[in-house]
C-alpha cells in the first residue's frame, strides 16, 4: 500500500510541474495563462510568440512523462499503469495551478517513449501528417492517440491496450473545448 501511495505521489507531483508557465515567466516575464488559449502547454507557448520556449516546453513536458514511468518500471513495476495515469493527471490537474493545467499531449508522448520507440514514432508521424494537412493541433493529437490505441490493440491485444484507451478518452476530455470549436469552425489553426 505504501508503495502504491508513493507511486501516486511522485508521478502526480512530477506531472504537476508546469514547465510552460515556468519558462515563459522566467524568460519573457509573462503569464502564459493570460495569452492565447490560456493553456500552459507547448502549443500555446508557440502560438504566443516563442517557438524556442514552446519546443523546450514540449521536451520537458514529455520528459516528465517518460521519467515518471521509467522510475516506476525499475522500482515498482507492478504500479506501471498507475504511474502512466497519475503523471498525466498531474499535468492536466496541477496542484500548483489550483488543479488546472495543460491538455496532456506532450506528457502522453513521454509515456509512449517509456513503452517503446515504435509508439511515439507512430504518434509523431501521424500527428505531423494530420496537423500539416488540417493545421489543427487538437485534431492531430486526438486522431493520433486513436491510431496508437489501434496499433497497440492489433499488436499486443486487449489487456495491454486499456491504458491507451484511457488516454484516448482523457485526451478527448481535455480537448472538449477544441472539439466544440472544430464543430463550429472557430478552432484556431496553427501556422507552420
Where are these regions (language model features)?
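Interfacial segments of multi-pass membrane proteins
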Residues: 46-49, 68, 72-76, 105-134, ...
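Cytosolic, membrane-interface loops and tails of multi-pass inner-membrane proteins
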Residues: 21-53, 176, 180-192
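Short, non-helical or kinked segments that cap or interrupt transmembrane helices
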Residues: 30-39, 97-107, 136-144
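Alpha-helical transmembrane segments in multi-pass membrane proteins
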Residues: 7, 11-16, 20, 24, ...
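Acidic (Asp/Glu-rich) catalytic motifs at the cytosolic membrane interface
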Residues: 23, 34, 42, 46, ...
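C-terminal ends of transmembrane helices
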Residues: 20-23, 91-100, 127-134, 176-181
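Membrane-embedded alpha-helical segments of multi-pass transporters/permeases
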Residues: 20, 69-70, 96, 132, ...
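Loop-to-transmembrane alpha-helix initiation sites
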Residues: 137-144, 156-166
Amino acid at each position: 500500500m505504501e508503495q502504491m501511495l508513493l507511486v501516486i505521489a511522485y508521478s502526480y507531483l512530477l506531472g504537476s510541474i508546469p514547465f510552460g508557465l515556468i519558462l515563459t515567466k522566467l524568460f519573457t516575464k509573462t503569464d502564459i495563462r493570460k495569452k492565447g488559449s490560456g493553456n500552459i502547454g507547448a502549443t500555446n507557448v508557440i502560438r504566443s510568440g516563442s517557438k524556442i520556449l514552446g519546443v523546450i516546453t514540449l521536451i520537458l513536458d514529455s520528459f516528465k512523462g517518460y521519467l515518471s514511468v521509467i522510475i516506476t518500471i525499475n522500482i515498482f513495476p507492478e504500479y506501471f499503469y498507475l504511474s502512466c495515469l497519475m503523471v498525466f493527471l498531474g499535468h492536466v490537474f496541477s496542484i500548483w495551478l489550483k488543479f488546472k493545467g495543460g491538455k496532456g499531449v506532450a506528457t502522453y508522448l513521454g509515456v509512449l517513449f517509456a513503452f517503446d520507440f515504435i509508439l511515439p514514432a507512430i504518434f509523431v508521424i501521424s500527428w505531423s501528417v494530420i496537423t500539416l494537412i488540417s493545421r489543427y493541433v487538437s485534431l492531430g493529437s486526438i486522431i493520433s492517440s486513436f491510431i496508437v490505441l489501434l496499433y497497440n490493440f492489433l499488436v499486443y491485444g486487449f489487456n495491454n491496450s486499456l491504458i491507451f484507451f484511457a488516454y484516448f478518452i482523457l485526451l478527448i476530455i481535455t480537448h472538449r473545448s477544441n472539439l466544440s470549436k472544430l464543430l463550429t469552425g472557430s478552432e484556431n489553426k496553427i501556422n507552420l
